[in-house]
Design a protein with these regions (language model features):
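Vicinal oxygen chelate
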Residues: 1-15, 34-92, 98-130, 141-145
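A conserved hydrophobic helix/loop-capping motif in glycosyltransferases and polysaccharide synthases
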Residues: 17-19
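Conserved active-site tyrosine of GNAT-family acetyltransferases
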Residues: 26-31, 103, 134
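Short, glycine-anchored, charge-dense loop/turn motifs used at functional sites
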Residues: 131-137
Length: 145
């Protein structure tokens, strides 16, 4: 007799929480540069991206991610990112250039200029922007060859 599997609950949307050094400055950045709707709670939302901005108690609490260790066991020849990622946002291939130019036009800091790479049967476009506290927001797109 086959054992009955137990029902499992479903996770909902996950949100990133970001400790920032100056809440008002960060709210302006996410609103004016990234085009987010920002509420008084500190939620910065645009399309499928939501980041919760919270005032850090001290500057030492603001800690963007460091570069991750390289790995040899990815399914393709990729070993990992070349810089620290705090947020990775998938965008469509067609929207990628539009978003980069919008952010650049709004005064956003493009820390890593857009580049294209390949892994197996996939072509990728990535860029990295930095917010006022140095958090890396990677915009990435992919398509099959």
């Amino acid at each position: 007799m086959e054992a009955l599997s137990k029902p499992k609950g479903k996770f909902g949307q996950s949100l990133q929480v970001r400790l920032v050094s100056d809440l008002e400055k960060s709210q302006r950045y996410y609103r004016d540069v990234l085009g987010c709707k920002v509420d008084n709670w500190g939620h910065a939302e645009r399309d499928g991206m939501t980041i919760i901005l919270q005032q850090a108690s001290s500057q030492e609490d603001v800690r963007p991610n460091a570069l991750s260790k390289k790995r040899q066991d990815y399914p393709t020849d990729w070993e990992g990112p070349k810089f620290g990622w705090d947020t990775y946002i998938h965008v469509s291939w067609d929207d990628f250039d539009l978003l980069v130019e919008e952010i650049r036009g709004n005064g956003g800091f493009i820390a890593v200029e857009p580049y294209t790479d390949t892994h197996g049967i996939w072509e990728f476009k990535n860029t990295c922007i930095k917010d006022p506290d140095g958090y890396s927001i990677v915009l990435g797109s992919m398509r099959e060859f």
